[in-house]
Amino acid sequence: MSKTRVIYPGTFDPITNGHVDLVTRASRMFDEVVVAIAIGHHKNPLFSLEERVALAQSSLGHLSNVEFVGFDGLLVNFFKEQKATAVLRGLRAVSDFEYEFQLANMNRQLDPHFEAVFLTPSEQYSFISSTLIREIARLKGDVTKFVPQAVVEAFERKHQQGW
């Protein structure tokens, strides 16, 4: 039987405890999990791609079947390159579903083998988003219960650099 390989794509700017929860759960469901960190040109990320990959590795590196890859371009092309079984997406709210449903159908039009798997977050993470976390951190609020310690430290370094 062939191995199941799922891609969990995102900008992860920064990775949150919600992301960590989904990857941890996915690592029990799939043989291999690829955390695919998008360059994210259109989002003007706070953290560089290298920083985001390092933060993901420090937060999830203890999971032996999880790897971390930066990527650029269409997700459907990356899906094919990685010979993936499916793409994993988290759904926090109905509004997420509408967007993800449309995206999955478009990707399936581009590649009929494209499959999307949706997971809802554990309840305590259902309201967390990287955008909210960045805003709280920018205003020097306490984000320690929403992100891994490595991210807290990365925000502290950004503040020291004048962010």
From Swiss-Prot:
Top-level EC class as recorded in UniProt: transferase
InterPro entries xref list: Cyt_trans-like, PPAT, Rossmann-like_a/b/a_fold
Report the family membership.
Answer: Belongs to the bacterial CoaD family.
Q: Which protein are we looking at? A: Phosphopantetheine adenylyltransferase
- Gene expressing this chain: coaD
Subcellular localization is given as:
Cytoplasm
Its job: Reversibly transfers an adenylyl group from ATP to 4'-phosphopantetheine, yielding dephospho-CoA (dPCoA) and pyrophosphate.
* Coiled coil, from the record: none
* Residues the entry annotates as binding substrate: 11, 43, 75, 89
Write down the EC number: 2.7.7.3
Q: Which GO terms describe its cellular component?
A: cytoplasm
Q: Which UniProt keywords apply?
A: ATP-binding, Coenzyme A biosynthesis, Cytoplasm, Magnesium, Nucleotide-binding, Nucleotidyltransferase, Transferase
Site positions (Transition state stabilizer) are 19
Q: Which reaction does it catalyse?
A: (R)-4'-phosphopantetheine + ATP + H(+) = 3'-dephospho-CoA + diphosphate
Annotated metabolic or biological route of this protein: Cofactor biosynthesis; coenzyme A biosynthesis; CoA from (R)-pantothenate: step 4/5
Matches recorded under SUPFAM superfamilies: Nucleotidylyl transferase
Supply the PANTHER family for this chain.
PHOSPHOPANTETHEINE ADENYLYLTRANSFERASE
Chain positions recorded as ATP binding sites: 11-12, 19, 90-92, 100, 125-131
What Gene Ontology molecular function terms does this protein carry?
ATP binding; pantetheine-phosphate adenylyltransferase activity
Oligomer and partners: Homohexamer.
Tell me one GO biological process term: coenzyme A biosynthetic process
Q: Which co-factor is required? A: Mg(2+)
Q: Name one Pfam family in it.
A: CTP_transf_like
The scientific name of the source species is Acinetobacter baumannii (strain AYE)
